[in-house]
Amino acid sequence: MKVTVVGAGAVGATCADNIARKELCEELVLLDIKEGIAEGKAQDMMQTAALLGFDTKIVGSTNDYSKTAGSDVVVITSGLPRKPGMTREELIGVNAGIVKGVCENILKHSPNAIIIVISNPMDTMTYLALTSTGLPKNRIIGMGGALDSSRFRYQLSQHLGCSPADLNAVVVGGHGDTTMIPLIRLATWNSAPVTKFLSEDQQKQIVADTMVGGATLTKLIGTSAWYAPGAAGAAMVEAIVRDEKKLFTCCVSLNGEYGQKDICLGVHVIIGKNGWEKILDFGLNAEEQAAFNKSADAVRSMNDVLKTL
């Protein structure tokens, strides 16, 4: 089994580190456009192997895609963060070129790879990866919902005083602080609805804090988060390489599901060796469906920017 992570920044390196520690593949390639960065981080990770007890071979590469040949799974984290004064259109314009180029290079050497997209704006970059490559839709997966759902479980655990591991909670819709939809109605604590233990005000606060979770971290640390995004990407890789048939919320192509077509949005999916294998419709109520439709409209407007490039 071979996995490639494109982009050796904080998110990519963290994702690669998680993959290596869990021994999810025999060979892990970390690739970046900046000279020496991927090689250096790969060596640094390899030098923890004796301490942590893993046996994954980690190879760093400066933009040499031949080293990624034969990858079973590729995680794309490359792209620029949104800078002060940068418009949404400018960010999409820059990162669309990066993601499209990465996909082209990856498929030259790994035509059968499953691609996980973490680059932002994630819903639009996932849609671009799908439409530009022409790959079967099950082989293109956006990470956003997996991260947002983990943040949702964290917020719930803080109010309930329990372990996040004892909670089941999902976020659907877009990966953005105005487009995500935390489904607190469906959240459970060891099978019991969390709404039994939380006041209406607490529920509203948890949903609000989840939606601005990424922005809160950016304000605190001065840059985008990396531990949870990297771990979310690695968890998806694990579900694929171990054929776990595991339920995630991920950004995938919709063809009528949840009332939407020609768009990639976060919904419940089963992930296994074939990528995403099935969409599960948990049944949104009228209020949730209206929010989902609004989220789709916002993401679709971002996707429209791709037509101008």
Go through each PLM region and give its residues.
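Rossmann-like NAD(P)-binding element
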Residues: L51-A113
